[in-house]
Amino acid sequence: DAILIIGANPRKEAPVLNARIRKRWLSGELTITLIGAQADLTYDYDYAGAGAESLMQFIETAQPVGKLLVLVGQGALSRSDGGAILALAAKAAQKLGGVGEGWNGFSVLHTAAARVGALDLGFTPGAGALDAQAMAKAGALDVIFNLGADEIAIDPGAFVVYIGSHGDRGAHRADVILPGAAYTEKSGIFVNTEGRVQMSSRVVFPPGDAREDWAILRALSGALGQPLPFDSLSALRKKLIEAYPHFGRVDQIAPGAATQISALAAQPAQAGREPVLSMIHDFYLTNPIARASAVMAECSALAQGRLTQAAE
């Protein structure tokens, strides 16, 4: 019945999802509200403001609807007060129709292909551990294994082992490069932004000495005298599904617990006044594969030229 978008530009961050939103909007009787940077999303929306203050005001003044979809972007979460904004978004969902009997419309829009699956595996800093930004600072660590993380700058000092498929930023910082396979060169399990487990199959073999990531890590573990308990992709998948059964339920969504949203909404939320901006600044160069493409570079240059002309 209604969609609340917070700190996201679905047209750039998730074009397929944006097309679904537009399709639903064209069918009528859908109210869309945007909090963040204004943009052409290909459908009409009510603009409620740029920051957390606007979100708090919206929570106080808006009326509940039948089924509300709350879409929280990484632009809202990748800030020092991201936790507070997430709590406010949960409060909006709880109060305005985002959570109810048979309906959970509280959603986070991710901008990295592997992030949802990583969260399912618990890839988050434990108590007292370092997050990625802290790891990258000078003097934090002696050795860093970089598994294709090209959007973070690692300060001088640490010895960096890079495992990836393209000669992007992470490879340029590396002391040792172990060439990995691109997603088209290996079979894998992916989890999309809605939490649906999906499988992909290898199209071609990786070139040269490149290997699939799991094989590289398995070989390293053996060389270090601590061999991992698998010798094939099928054995690795068996271990994965034993530890995390929902990875075996392909094309199914693991439902979220509404109680967790209630607990999140109850947290204190002291958010800043800064505008909530989208994380995507150049649609055509958002990942290492796109940045290695001459066609994408040309598209980016043409798009930037149009923006410059519009500004003039």
Describe each PLM feature range:
Residues 1-255, 308-312:
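Non-catalytic alpha/beta scaffold blocks inside enzyme catalytic domains
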Residues 237-312:
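Long, low-complexity segments enriched in small/aliphatic residues
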